Amino acid sequence: MKRKERRINKDFGYNRKCVCHYEASQKRFCYSQYSCASVLYERVRDIAKIMDRLDSGLDAWCLRDAIISVLRATHCVPRVDRMLGRWYLKTSIFYDFCPDDLILSCPNVIMPNVLNFVKKYRDFIRSVLYKVSVSWKNQYMPGVLGASRFLEEISNSLNGVEESIPCIYLRMCATLTEIVLRNGYLREIYQENPYVIFEELAFSLFTQKWVLPFSCMTNLGLVEKANSTVFDVAIYNTCLYSLADFITVNGEHLFPALLNGSNISMNVTRYQQEAKNIFEILLSQIQVVERDTDKTVQLTVYVEVWHVSALTWLDLYQVLPETSRVTFCLIIPGIFMDRYELKRAQWSLFHKNIAFELGKCDEVTFSTKYLEFERTTDHAKITMASFVEKICRCLKRGRMGLIFRKNVYQYSMIPHVPLYCGGDFLDVLPVRDGINTCLRMLLNVVHFLGDEVSDELTEEIDFVRLQCKFFMFNELRRVVRKMVLVANAVIDYAVDNKDFLREGIVDGRSLGICITGLHSVFMTVGLSYAHPDACRLYRMMCEHIYYTCVRTSVDCCMKGAEPCNLFDRSKYALGMLYFDQFDNVECTLPEELWTTLRKDVLMHGVRNIHFTAGTAMQKEFDIINSSESFWPMEDNKILRRSNIKVVIGKDGLNDVTSVYSSELKSLYIPVYNNLLLNRFNKHQQYLKTVGYRVLNVDTNLFTDKELDDLAVFKDGFSYPLNDLIEMYKSGLPFLDQGQANVFYFNDTVSLKHLLPLLYKTGFKVAMYKVLCSSEMYKHLDLSNPLPLIGKCSDGVVMHVKNIL
């Protein structure tokens, strides 16, 4: 039967009509007829019919806005969430335009070599897309929030038609396969034909075993254009001080990075008089980008605690709105921590030139110079107790990082280079003044749980037994190896196509493989977060990932690639590996593998200088139904308030004259843990009354077995701080970039004790977020439980997040 032709809606502006009552509206779907819970429940089929008439993903975005606007009055939210996620595919061009047809119709947008690849393998590509799309729709397709995340961040229009998710993945797979085939060393390592390479990439992306950053998804394979990038972090390391200097750099690098959806980081304390003006410029640019492009961006501000302006910045941070996407990161030298707990100790703060001289010192000479300047120069003083109190007040507000300068210098693979000016909690290499960056990739370790193993595999090396499950390390190593090859392909692509951030990647070719889904693994196999077996499993994951990354990077050099420019200056040139700098490191892999690797590194070099990172990719995690990083609590549903309107009905349920209120001021978003609900479905109503905090349940209502199972779902406030740090500490010898964590505090615990504990443990970059129990649960009204809105596989407890 001939399929009905459908019109492409290109009227994406103020002139189009709302499809629910056919009146002029700024929104494609204003939802005025469905402003009541009962109406929404009864009219799910009507919504489906309307969605069938939508022409693009942008329309699905508008519909999603409208539905979310009334969610707090809806008792069937999970059903609507799942339904909207399924219908998202039908509103995309995937059903109306084959992705390959769309790509081939856009020679002015898609790179010629990508077009040629799609033409050459068109029939095969169609068969692969059909297979992977079936699996994707049944298992991995995002719900309403995940789908809208795509619509926020990737807004490519190919000749008036927005890309669908399958079209985006096709463009990426075709581009990456073409790069691998064109680069000799990558082709030599793969040793596979184009069909195998393309199919493997497609299945990895659709099933979300690993994820590239959104900036890469947006720009990979498109015709070269000015100020486009595939990197999601831009770090500005500067010795310039004037506002004019900043404006030049901002126009060339920082603002274009924001327009691409990249997070930017810079050290502002070295700007003295102009610092506030610069900060205001950056904040206004973030607002403009988020308003006009729907992309989510973030600013990280680095503050040197020996600079006299540090107090001003800490005071400023305390008055920033909670919703601002600004993270402060304190750069803390060793001498500060030496004085940290001394009674009546004082801290000296220096002015511009002296502070800058201290910033250039390595950690060995920093303390000597600091004491000398204390004796011989004018400076300000503050008691350590007062300074620490300011820091703790800022930490309680959340989104503050710490960089322990001494630990960075001690464990850096590049000696005498100040690596502390990192980006988004990665100590990326600022080897020169200017822009530095890193390619980050997200690895979802949930995919490596299996129910059976082959007799040919070796326990403790190829797999470990976890109660009724197996964690497959052989598969983990295989996937990570392909991730490193893909990362090098993307970096080569950026250099060849004049990516405007390419100068920040060429010397170190740094890549960061960020772990996510770890806690889902623990919950699935029945391990509490701080259980010794959980700590051991996490350490083994980090070990296998690091080994595979270095092994693959060396293999690239053995197949003809040049070592990165920083190799000769690094400790790798001495035949060292990162964990060689730590004492008494437990390794599971055979020693002969490490010995061979050291010899090969010394003889052939490494293609990349950094590999693994225990840090968060804050935007990409949502599309894989996983938490940002590895911590025993979930905090990962963020709705943009700029696009959300609340529909206020008048008299009748079907009143089409309903109007929008002002922009949404507060929206409660309960997030539920799917695994918890499935295991304790019959107790769901009771668990809702205690806010899903398993430590608050009445033990008389559960069997002993159920209580043991419930313990797996404890929230972060239920674990002693030392247990959490031991968990995070276990992976440190194999994480050569920053490790950012969330720390949970009951109100009886003092934040002052956390900093020295992290410092002495050996953390380089830490403290992504601090959550206090009173703040976390202050919006949770247990007398009036709210409906469940999102579905997520990771995390521990259900909670309510307040968007102001």
From Swiss-Prot:
A GO-annotated cellular component: virion component
Disulfide bonds: none
SUPFAM superfamilies xrefs: PFL-like glycyl radical enzymes (SSF51998)
Signal peptide range: none
Pfam families: Ribonuc_red_lgC
Gene Ontology terms describing biological process: deoxyribonucleotide biosynthetic process
Superkingdom field: Viruses
Predominant localisation class: virion
GO MF entries: ATP binding; ribonucleoside-diphosphate reductase activity, thioredoxin disulfide as acceptor
InterPro entries: HSV_RIR1_betahv, NrdE_NrdA_C, RNR_lg_C, Rrm1
Xref: PROSITE patterns: RIBORED_LARGE (PS00089)
Gene3D superfamilies named among the record's database cross-references: 3.20.70.20
Subcellular location: Virion; Host cytoplasm
Keywords recorded for this protein, A-Z: Host cytoplasm, Late protein, Virion
Function: Does not possess a ribonucleotide reductase activity. Betaherpesviruses probably use another strategy to expand the dNTP pool in a quiescent host cell.
Similarity annotation: Belongs to the ribonucleoside diphosphate reductase large chain family.
Quaternary organization: The genome of human herpesvirus-6 does not code for a ribonucleotide reductase small subunit.
Name used for this protein in its record: Ribonucleoside-diphosphate reductase large subunit-like protein
